[in-house]
Amino acid sequence: MPELPEVETTLRGLLPYLTNQLIYSLTLRRRTLRWDIPSHIESRLPGHRITTVCRRAKYLLIDTNAGGSLIIHLGMSGTLRLLAPETPLRPHDHVDIMLNNRRVLRFNDPRRFGCLLWQEDGQIHPLLQRLGCEPLSDSFNGDYLYQCSRARNVSVKTFLMDQRIVVGVGNIYAAESLFRAGISPLCEADKISLQRYRRLAEVVKDILLYAINRGGTTLRDFLSPDGRPGYFKQELFVYGRQQQPCKQCGSLLRQTTIRQRTTVWCGHCQG
């Protein structure tokens, strides 16, 4: 599933080409993804402009002057690409937004776990109402994590992936952050010191920013809007490397399951 760096990479690729563009048409080839796509957007959006594009957690918000914003989530396998209008359709090309710069924004989602929803101006969609802190913001720091973790009797990996605490950190970046901070993913969240949480917050920010600069992590489905893969996969220390030698100490990496998620860590470096 695309995590924050992949969504941020998509945002940065789209923003220069979508801002202030007039929407000529919107074509829905499928009416339902994870949830029903609001049918009114087909008639509501043409003739209006995209004012900006932003990100909240793993959601992309395409703001318009039509009185609201499109909310897009890429789900497990979704991609957004900017294409020439004559580009042949591929299987699972569900949505086209035709723009006045002779480009079409095409949403492809083979597994259909993504979504395309609508948020009226002045309202906050229910999906966005309980989201936690943005990890690249100034408010995300070790003190914040420490305070949120008190009386939280869950593993630190589960805690770090809780979107009500911090958004956009999924299995890949939680595993990598905990490794580089030297914290076992099995450690209980409320047993970790303030000093170690401060280190963890720094590492999370550093890894996310580095992954964004590397175009995200392409494991199977993710491509940036220009069709290029992300290259952070080459930098992974633990994720997906179970039973391989630790790049740092040479010990065999361990594997377990935490909340139905495969978790890989180094028993020596994260002891």
Swiss-Prot record:
InterPro entries the record matches: DNA_glyclase/AP_lyase_DNA-bd, DNA_glyclase_Znf_dom_DNA_BS, Formamido-pyr_DNA_Glyclase, FPG_cat, MutM-like_N-ter, Ribosomal_uS13-like_H2TH, Znf_DNA_glyclase/AP_lyase
Listed EC numbers: 3.2.2.23, 4.2.99.18
Superkingdom of origin: Bacteria
Catalytic site positions: P2, E3, K58, R261
Entry binding sites for DNA: H92, R111, R152
ZnF (FPG-type) intervals: 237-271
Keywords: DNA damage, DNA repair, DNA-binding, Glycosidase, Hydrolase, Lyase, Metal-binding, Multifunctional enzyme, Zinc, Zinc-finger
Key word Nucleotide-binding present: no
SMART domains: Fapy_DNA_glyco, H2TH
Cofactor note (record): Binds 1 zinc ion per subunit.
Reactions listed under catalytic activity: Hydrolysis of DNA containing ring-opened 7-methylguanine residues, releasing 2,6-diamino-4-hydroxy-5-(N-methyl)formamidopyrimidine; 2'-deoxyribonucleotide-(2'-deoxyribose 5'-phosphate)-2'-deoxyribonucleotide-DNA = a 3'-end 2'-deoxyribonucleotide-(2,3-dehydro-2,3-deoxyribose 5'-phosphate)-DNA + a 5'-end 5'-phospho-2'-deoxyribonucleoside-DNA + H(+)
Pfam family membership, one: Fapy_DNA_glyco
GO molecular function: 8-oxo-7,8-dihydroguanine DNA N-glycosylase activity; class I DNA-(apurinic or apyrimidinic site) endonuclease activity; damaged DNA binding; zinc ion binding
Cofactors: Zn(2+)
Keyword Lyase set for record: yes
GO biological process terms, semicolon-separated: base-excision repair
Quaternary structure and interacting proteins, as annotated: Monomer.
Role noted for this protein: Involved in base excision repair of DNA damaged by oxidation or by mutagenic agents. Acts as a DNA glycosylase that recognizes and removes damaged bases. Has a preference for oxidized purines, such as 7,8-dihydro-8-oxoguanine (8-oxoG). Has AP (apurinic/apyrimidinic) lyase activity and introduces nicks in the DNA strand. Cleaves the DNA backbone by beta-delta elimination to generate a single-strand break at the site of the removed base with both 3'- and 5'-phosphates.
Family: Belongs to the FPG family.
PANTHER family: FORMAMIDOPYRIMIDINE-DNA GLYCOSYLASE
Protein name (record): Formamidopyrimidine-DNA glycosylase
The species this protein was found in: Xylella fastidiosa (strain Temecula1 / ATCC 700964)
Organism placement in taxonomy: Bacteria, Pseudomonadati, Pseudomonadota, Gammaproteobacteria, Lysobacterales
